[in-house]
């Protein structure tokens, strides 16, 4: 049975390197499923929960991906992301604190009507919520 080789790479190194039968990612245009034999492509990714169905019914892995790009070349899938964490590596307490900080920063930015700070806080909040969601899986 054909399978994908999936690597998730960040500036800190390889975060995930396994075989899979299916991966699901989210682009600005919506969700995309990648199966073995998928057409070659390069696409941008948004902050999302990447679902990886391991080969031979070995289970499902979840990875919190914070933007980046996906490249599919034959059956090799490479995700290059700003940051990424596997569900088992996420410290939920730390993620909750990051969410609270982002909420406070967003509230402050809205009060002062600072658009740049508001956007940064919104991104930080999306990332924290994504990490919490993946960490609970």
Swiss-Prot record:
Gene3D superfamilies given in the database record: ATP synthase delta/epsilon subunit, C-terminal domain, F0F1 ATP synthase delta/epsilon subunit, N-terminal
Keyword Electron transport part of the UniProt annotation: no
Any Pfam family hit: ATP-synt_DE_N
A Gene Ontology cellular-component term: plasma membrane
Keyword field: ATP synthesis, Cell membrane, CF(1), Hydrogen ion transport, Ion transport, Membrane, Transport
SUPFAM superfamilies: Epsilon subunit of F1F0-ATP synthase C-terminal domain, Epsilon subunit of F1F0-ATP synthase N-terminal domain
InterPro entries: ATP_F1_dsu/esu_C_sf, ATP_synth_F1_dsu/esu, ATP_synth_F1_dsu/esu_N, ATP_synth_F1_esu_C, ATPsynth_dsu/esu_N
HAMAP family to which the protein is assigned, alphabetical: ATP_synth_epsil_bac
Name this protein carries in UniProt: ATP synthase epsilon chain
């Amino acid at each position: 049975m054909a399978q994908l080789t999936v690597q998730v790479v960040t500036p800190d190194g390889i975060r995930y390197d396994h075989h899979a039968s299916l991966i699901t990612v989210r682009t600005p245009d919506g969700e995309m499923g990648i199966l073995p034999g998928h057409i070659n492509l390069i696409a941008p990714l948004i902050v999302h929960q990447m679902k990886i169905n391991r080969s031979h019914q070995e289970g499902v892995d979840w990875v919190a991906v914070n933007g980046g790009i996906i490249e599919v070349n034959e059956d090799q899938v490479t995700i290059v992301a700003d940051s990424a964490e596997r569900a088992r590596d996420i410290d939920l307490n730390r993620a909750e604190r990051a969410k609270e900080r982002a909420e406070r920063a967003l509230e402050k930015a809205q009060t002062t009507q600072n658009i740049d700070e508001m956007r940064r806080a919104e991104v930080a909040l999306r990332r924290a919520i994504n990490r919490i969601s993946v960490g609970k899986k």
